[in-house]
Amino acid sequence: MYAVFQSGGKQHRVSEGQTIRLEKLEVATGETIEFDTVMMVADGDNIQIGAPILEGVKVKAEVVAHGRGEKVKIVKFRRRKHSRKQQGHRQWFTDVKITGIA
């Protein structure tokens, strides 16, 4: 059984027991969270597709950890002008473990 839900402007395909990395959520570590923007649920040959969201279906997950991703370097370089600008960025993320699809 798997489901497709939306979080942080992205769609994620998950199954029970899977750990995924989402955009930062303002939820404490160890707490349970429910995602109600489920777009599709498949259980064998039984497939339900929302238009765009399924009513009454939720994906339950437990927050495992928060953190920051790898650094991405941004470089702006102008040739022959002796001009260069460097910047770095580390995106916040939340790891969640899917506990149920109902």
Curated annotation (Swiss-Prot):
Give GO terms: molecular function aspect only. rRNA binding; structural constituent of ribosome
Q: Name one GO cellular component term.
A: cytoplasm
Where does the record locate the signal sequence feature? none
Q: Is Iron-sulfur tagged as a keyword?
A: no
What are the transmembrane regions?
Answer: none
Q: Name one GO biological process term.
A: translation
Which keywords accompany this UniProt record?
Ribonucleoprotein, Ribosomal protein, RNA-binding, rRNA-binding
What protein family is recorded?
Belongs to the bacterial ribosomal protein bL21 family.
Q: What does this protein do?
A: This protein binds to 23S rRNA in the presence of protein L20.
Tell me the subunit arrangement. Part of the 50S ribosomal subunit. Contacts protein L20.
- Name the UniProt record assigns to this protein: Large ribosomal subunit protein bL21
Q: What organism does this protein naturally occur in?
A: Proteus mirabilis (strain HI4320)
